[in-house]
Amino acid sequence: MKFIVKLFPEIMMKSKPVRMRFTKMLETNIRNVLKKVDETAKVQRQWDKIMVMVPDDRPDLVEAFAERLACIPGIAHVLQVNVSTFTTVDDIYQQTLVAYKEQLAGKTFCVRVKRAGKHDFNSIEVERYVGGGLNQFTEAAGVRLKNPDMTVHLEIDNDNLYLIDKRIEGLGGFPMATQEDVLSLISGGFDSGVSSYQFIKRGSRTHYCFFNLGGDQHEIGVKQVAYHLWQKYGESHKVKFISVPFDPVVQEILERIDNGQMGVILKRMMMRAATRVAQKMGIQALVTGEAMGQVSSQTLTNLNVIDRCTEQLILRPLIAMDKQDIINISRQIGTEDFAKSIPEYCGVISQKPTVKAVLAKVEAEEAKFSEDLLDRVIADAEIIDIKEIATQMDTKITATETVDAISAGEIIIDVRAPEEEEKSPLELDGVEVKAIPFFKLATQFADLDKEKNYLLYCDRGVMSKLQALYLQEQGYNNVKVYRP
């Protein structure tokens, strides 16, 4: 079994040197991701595609490879194929007949062939020969060239025949790290998660800057979002997660700033702090999830005033998107459930926000801040490799709270997303297993029997640890992490 990785069309349009560079980087990215699934993963770059080989003795890797390839930027689509050699057109037909005879029963069909190399036949001749044979010697309902029930896809590359078993749509975009790095201001909500994803997809290593306004619980939730985005879409490269303690800034805003200017000034302070972080990291651009008119600070007038506080490029990929479209994308990329459980902190500090801020007035209000305020919060910022989020949870959750065995009376809570739990349900003899997705656990845990002990489970142990830490912050001492 092999996968044929087809490049995103915009890559194919590049000049030869750029195209080669992008293809090499995509090959490396694929190898980096798949080696985390299996160390023996083999990836081979060709001019217009990349081949991924699955060992014949490891059919269990097919689905895992397919899932990972579908989430790597730079891929248009992936073809899951069975590979063989052929000698004649009739040989191609005979192999196709064996592969598709049962599937064609009672269905209309057509045959589509792509060919590369030197042959004494063309693609249309193969389509006619194979299609005619299948129509005559199978129980198919007949040939239909437009809107058939089934299309038999074949690819011929010199003397190799690829019988296409499945087509998997890719993420599109450019390979990771073909574009410059960006620093995404992430709050954990719908918008910042989607805007971060847009730049990952476009080929930028996306680092995360979080302004903590809500304490440890807020930070835990946002780290889950950032870790999910990195693990699913950007795992081929290292990125940083920066947490800036912004409660001193909020406190001074509440004490010293005119109520109507609070929202705009808070955003300006965030941009100033993010600019300093970006400059330290050698990053040229900031990314935000702002959409025009969505809230009071996001009118064109206010966005203009916000941008005046920094010379750093501020990118807003969602600027003209509707909220529902943003939510739909968040659902597709798996951040919707996180966002639902994280409150919006920025909006609570101003009761009557202005929609037409005046720069001079804003600057006059900002003069009331302590001179060293930003210096202090930047000095206290925590910068970690995003992979360390899992390690951090290990250090905060003691050894007695992480177990690999289940005691009598303990209950397992499977915190995986519903689709993951349904795909491979956790079944243990003599043990009660409750399926409560991570995004519902915070609200449903209080309804559980307080006399019982609960063990949280997920595939990699990251989400279960984050949820355990969150519940412990809430005062629950009857929760542990289950790592079999």
From Swiss-Prot:
Domain THUMP per the UniProt entry, residue ranges: 63-167
Main subcellular location: cytoplasm
SUPFAM superfamilies: Adenine nucleotide alpha hydrolases-like (SSF52402), Rhodanese/Cell cycle control phosphatase (SSF52821), THUMP domain-like (SSF143437)
Residues of the Rhodanese domain: 406-484
MF GO annotations: ATP binding; CCA tRNA nucleotidyltransferase activity; tRNA binding; tRNA-uracil-4 sulfurtransferase activity
Pathway note: Cofactor biosynthesis; thiamine diphosphate biosynthesis
Superkingdom, natural source: Bacteria
InterPro entries, A to Z: Rhodanese-like_dom, Rhodanese-like_dom_sf, Rossmann-like_a/b/a_fold, ThiI_AANH, ThiI_fer, ThiI_N, THII_Thiazole_biosynth_dom, THUMP_dom
Disulfide cysteine pairs (residue numbers): 346-458
Any GO BP annotation: tRNA 4-thiouridine biosynthesis
Keywords, sorted A to Z: ATP-binding, Cytoplasm, Disulfide bond, Nucleotide-binding, Redox-active center, RNA-binding, Thiamine biosynthesis, Transferase, tRNA-binding
EC class name: transferase
CDD domains reported in the protein's UniProt record: PPase_ThiI, RHOD, THUMP_ThiI
Residues at the catalytic site: 458 (cysteine persulfide intermediate)
Family listed: Belongs to the ThiI family.
Protein name: tRNA sulfurtransferase
Lineage, highest ranks first: Bacteria, Pseudomonadati, Pseudomonadota, Gammaproteobacteria, Alteromonadales
